[in-house]
Amino acid sequence: SLIELGKMIFQETGKNPVKNYGLYLCNCGVGNRGKPVDATDRCCFVHKCCYKKVTGCDPKKDRYSYSWENKAIVCGEKNPPCLKQVCECDKAVAICLRENLQTYDKKHRVTVKFLCKAPESC
């Protein structure tokens, strides 16, 4: 769910997920997808594509288990297949955001989404 996603983002980046990524550029948080503008935005684009492949559960609402072990996200073994997939999507975006912190630009924290160019396909 968005709760676990937010925790993972905070654990990996040290940033408040809602404040820093909730409206970041074209693909992070709410709103329509657009052509990714920077590496951080591309992480979010790939995450939305990952969610599109999930069937059988609601990635934004359904809770799953994971743990934080030795500064690493470990998806719970007892999660059903669908939620295991959601956990892996969320883990991947959290790691991607950490790996691309150097491209994060505070001035893009709030972006008017209609200015985004047409989206790429997944």
From Swiss-Prot:
Superkingdom per UniProt: Eukaryota
Subcellular location: Secreted
SUPFAM superfamilies per record: Phospholipase A2, PLA2
Important for membrane-damaging activities in eukaryotes and bacteria: annotated span: 106-117
Pfam family, one: Phospholip_A2_1
Summary of the tissues where the protein is detected: Expressed by the venom gland.
An example Gene Ontology CC term for this record: extracellular region
SS bonds (residue pairs): C26-C116, C28-C44, C43-C96, C49-C122, C50-C89, C57-C82, C75-C87
CDD domains noted in UniProt: PLA2c (cd00125)
One BP annotation, GO: lipid catabolic process
Main location as per UniProt: secreted
MF GO annotations: calcium ion binding; calcium-dependent phospholipase A2 activity; phospholipid binding; toxin activity
Sites marked Important residue of the cationic membrane-docking site (MDoS): K106, R109
Function description: Snake venom phospholipase A2 (PLA2) that has almost no phospholipase A2 activity. Is myotoxic. Displays edema-inducing activities. A model of myotoxic mechanism has been proposed: an apo Lys49-PLA2 is activated by the entrance of a hydrophobic molecule (e.g. fatty acid) at the hydrophobic channel of the protein leading to a reorientation of a monomer.
Membership in a protein family: Belongs to the phospholipase A2 family. Group II subfamily. K49 sub-subfamily.
Official protein name in the record: Basic phospholipase A2 homolog
Organism: Protobothrops mucrosquamatus (Taiwan habu)
Origin organism lineage: Eukaryota, Metazoa, Chordata, Craniata, Vertebrata
